Swiss-Prot record:
Binds 3 Mg(2+) ions per subunit. PROSITE patterns: AA_TRNA_LIGASE_II. The lineage of its organism: Bacteria, Pseudomonadati, Pseudomonadota, Gammaproteobacteria, Lysobacterales. Keywords: Aminoacyl-tRNA synthetase, ATP-binding, Cytoplasm, Ligase, Magnesium, Metal-binding, Nucleotide-binding, Protein biosynthesis. Its EC number is 6.1.1.6. Mg(2+) 1 binds at E416, E423. PANTHER family: LYSINE--TRNA LIGASE, CHLOROPLASTIC_MITOCHONDRIAL (PTHR42918:SF15), LYSYL-TRNA SYNTHETASE (PTHR42918). It is an enzyme of class 6 (ligase). It comes from Xylella fastidiosa (strain M12). Its cofactor is Mg(2+). Belongs to the class-II aminoacyl-tRNA synthetase family. This is Lysine--tRNA ligase. GO terms for molecular function: ATP binding; lysine-tRNA ligase activity; magnesium ion binding; tRNA binding. GO terms for cellular component: cytosol.
Amino acid sequence: MTEHLPASQVSFDENALIAERRAKLLALRAQGVVYPNDVKREHYAADVQAAFANVETWTAETLEASSHRVRMAGRLMAKRLMGKASFAQIQDESGRIQLLIQSNVLGEDSYAAFKVLDVGDIIAVEGGLTRTRTGELSVKVNVLRLLTKALRPLPDKWHGLTDVEQRYRQRYVDLIVTPESREIFIKRSKIIRALRTWLDARLFLEVETPMMHYIPGGAAAKPFVTYHNALDLELYLRVAPELYLKRLVVGGLERVYEINRNFRNEGVSTRHNPEFTMLELYEAYSTYHEVMDLAETMIRDTAQSVLGTTQVIWDGAQIDLGPIFRRWRMDEAVCHHNPEISVAECTDRDALLLHCERLKIKVKSSYGWGRLLLSIFEATVEHTLIQPTFITDHPVEISPLARESDIESGYTDRFELFINGKEIANGFSELNDPEEQAMRFQKQVEAKEGGDDEAMYYDADYIRALEYGMAPTGGLGIGVDRLVMLLTGSTSIRDVLLFPYMRPER
């Protein structure tokens, strides 16, 4: 028999199964054999499978004649009772391997104890190796111990964890039963490690900056508010580390980066989570053109390092990170996708208002031409940018921390990287003129007083830092979660966060 229930019965029978397992645990407690902590694991499933993969060399006869023995531990994932000989599968962090369990090898008492184990229990086994008639490598078990009794049944193996919300809420179950989820999070770890390795090799210094700020800044976003009792002080969870990292550049740390969490009190979607991971870096004596080169090379090299290729499929689109990424001015992109809009109209507020009305784009009366241009870009261009594309030269109005262009007034030396219609990175030549920065902060304050929750606060200490002098600097922010989505082909940010934000269960 195989211990699995039809999906339709799982919910109905779960309480009964839990009660049955608790009864087994009670009996085990009476015997004093629960939750031991002295197991010595020496081998992993994937290593054993790889070492003895050659079927011609390692036949059942050669395996049983050899002196190879394994000591393994893992979760019991399947159990098939067949009289005096049974089969089972255990799973460890590396994979699965089959167990051959025979009463004449294991012993009658231990075999009887095995028969009452449940799928989900964690066990330790020892034994030699053999191969079944179907050619499957198996551990011929002669020692078996229960390490942890599982009181809740795992989802049915044929249907798995089909409730997406349950997968997110109970990630611990998802990781047990969904190999694809495990692989995503293993890749996530490798991606972050590859980013660090890439930057460290180029002499960037990894730093840590505060997670709680007196004044939220560094991004146009609504912050979470908290309170420090001892200091009697309202604080904000950071929306970005930017202003602290640039203070470090002022202090002479010319190449710095941070990979850490940001918090934004905004909506939840397939692309947004209130708590998310960002890579942010700054390099003195660098321009936004050089930062674009850096971002492009780092993303391409990370894909090659982790995936072994620069080609990925994301949400049905074939993405190639190998060729040079396209660079396209925002106003040119808007005009290309909206031929009725001329380049001259891109800085004409009244003309852009009429175009927004024609395109049925909702805007606020407080918007200047820069924010109106962005609104048209987001509605008509952004979703069309499938292959990697840098959208450059953003208006000053929407770029309060970026340096204004020397070539064209009203625009900045800024870029955003889009892949498959999603923003992956943002960067610019940093504004290092303290008087200009103070003026832009003041405009942000006026916007906030006018009802813009995402406008920035005035940070007087940051202005003071700039007054000591900051070298010409290029900065970059990469959404790590979205980069992981790209490199794992995931369509929702929740699929790449171990514990995404969810409403509390009722």
